[in-house]
Amino acid sequence: MPAPAFSGAGGFDSAFFAAYKHVYNQHKIQRLAYRNRPLFAALRKEDMFEGDTYNHSVMFEDPQGGSMTFATAIAQKMSSSQGARFILSRGREYQAISMDVEAIAATRSDKGSLLRKKVTETDRIIEEMSRRIDIAIHGDGTGILASFTTGSSLATTTITLDQPALGLRFSVGMYVQFATNSPTDGTAPTLADNGKFLQVISRNVTAKVTTITLSGQLASIGGLATTNKYFLVRNGCGIGFGTSNPYGGVSGLKSWLPINGPTVGESFWGFDRSVDAQRLAGSRYIAAPGEKFEVTLQNASAELELQNASADVVLLNPVDLNKYSQELGTKVRYMESDPGTTGLKTAGAMIIRGQSGDMKAISDPQVDPGTFYMLDMSTWWLATLNGVPHLDTADGSTARRESTSDGIEIRWRAWYQMVCDAPGRNMVGTFGY
């Protein structure tokens, strides 16, 4: 449906929308989207995801028909390279702004006041969209944000997160559902009480304890029990991903680099990665209990080197990076690092000496505490359809009539999927605390 046109008598016309589009040029969108999101900023974006799916091939083995004996090599000449084909579909994120027509008309002598109001609101929408995209590209595709463990009674509206630092994934006003499991194969989590949700009323987030107060008691969610672990999902996001789920979510770091490795018979975007667990699902390093941070990262780097791979970036939660810095004391070295491809921001990065050279330790709040990723950033990118995020101008305008009220709406959206060209050149690990 075409966007509404306002006559001069109404004091409002298409100039507002032209100005709105001008304000939100690509540079401003990137500046808002990438701020304090090093992984999102660093990922290469390729606007090429046309069609329903994208067939992404990863070559993981060279032809093995050679021999020191001529006759044997000739006999085995039909040996071919080994490749995995992942059939990817897009993940999505949507936001919209509603504008009341009467309020628009009431600003006819000062169109700039309306623009200023909507710019402020749009900035917050882009900020929130980008935060959700950032969470998704770190996640496992299930939509799970964090876990909590119930106490001896469900007659409470307050929960305490198992990992306090993950409290930043929640906001006052958001709606959460409760999952009884946390799948690792891309399937959607099982939601308690047919997906019934509660609203976040307040939160108190610290590095040591995070509590969230909900709009109702846990007892109001059918199927929950005392002293059990459950998982929190943003309403409408517990959809999983995979070839049988064309409207699923995003397979982020946790799914491309599973900490427990691929399972035999799995179907990760239609392929069983267990045929070569390292080259198709990355390397893994599990630190021994009490192992020092420095030792863990050096051992992990050596493990990655065994796979003929090397990383240039190590992503850690700020809590872990702080512990590592304190452990090193005066041995800490820093360098100036630009975590993004756009040059919008430089950040001081600690230097980690790896087996193949220096790696940049980057503080990333969306990495789970206790986990780290050693990444070859040249292997990671986002396959997109238009910008991530972008303004909806599908019908030639930035706005359209609302069907159930006297208003118009402006839509923002993102269509994208995270892609890795060589999982085997990357690693996931855990610290020993």
Task: List where the protein language model places each region.
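Short, glycine/acidic-enriched capping/hinge loops at junctions between secondary-structure elements
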Residues: 67-69
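Helix-start/capping segments and mature chain N-termini
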Residues: 73-75
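Core alpha/beta structural scaffold of self-assembling particle/tube/pore-forming proteins
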Residues: 1-65, 77-433
